[in-house]
Amino acid sequence: MEATLITPFNSYRTHVGFGAAGQVLAISENTVFKGPILLDNPAPSQREIMEDAMKSIENEKTMHRMLQRHAHPNIIHSILVLPEGIFLERLGMSLAERLTPTALPVDPGLEVRWIQQLVSAVEWLEGLGIAHGDLRPSNILLDNSQNLKIIDFDCAVKFGGELIAGGAPFSKMNDGFKSPPAGVETEVFAIGSCVYNIHFGHEPWSELNEVDGHEVAKKWCRHEYLPPGGDEIGVIIQRCWDGEFKSIRALDTVVKTLRSDGMVARRPSWLQAWFLLVDCRYFLAKDGLSMNKSLGARLRFLGWWGTHRCLSVAVKVERGFMIW
């Protein structure tokens, strides 16, 4: 029999994304679910992929449990961590999608805002002793206010650990295509490449990479970096690639001197977070996955009540229209 993809829910959910380890399903307009890629009737080689996927998602679940206690406005909000996977807030397009050649030009103030938010989030992880390990525009999403949020923590490791993900231009490589241990050096290098992508709208060596990707990889191993220009942001990129910053906090201090558009990202309010949680619990109750029958009944009632009155009123509260 042919292998088929398994989803963890009884009701069918629309897939909104796939990664090396995970599948992402739309739960509602505001929430998504990320779980491991699992197959029914897998081939022997696919079993190994499934085992790696489950390990990666377990690692990500560990990271999100920690981030629930140490939240940051520019790191994706995890709503609920379960044995099956992780419920997360649903965001918009990725930074990679926003920076495609056909997209609208990025305002300089917004560009600086993204740079500052990216560095702030990674500096926060530094304080927790964690390296994201796979910083790249495709692992960064934008909310409705164009604020940046880092996602995908399945490759995150403690400082000093071995990097799981790799590859130029977002992973620093030395001779033999080997990356140094995870830490300030690797994270700052990845930030430099992300900032280059934000500033110029494409990856470093992008045109040459399409012709000879192996030659480009060798250039990165030899530390032959494409000159990023002499403006303020270009200087920061070069310093990131050259490893001049001894901490991400030091880099954060420098990027804060740049002039952004002044917009500030905020974590979900307690009311927003509560309704995101209700959204997930209500879905689980409808899907028959709630382990507490009385809780499930209450959530079904809450969902019905919310559909008819509570949620609409609460949205008005959140928008400042009324209090109840």
Predicted ranges, named:
Residues 242-266:
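Terminal C-lobe "cap" of eukaryotic-type protein kinase domains
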Residues 109-124:
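Conserved alphaE helix
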Residues 122-143:
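Catalytic-loop of the protein kinase fold
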Residues 265-324:
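Regulatory extensions appended to serine/threonine kinase catalytic cores
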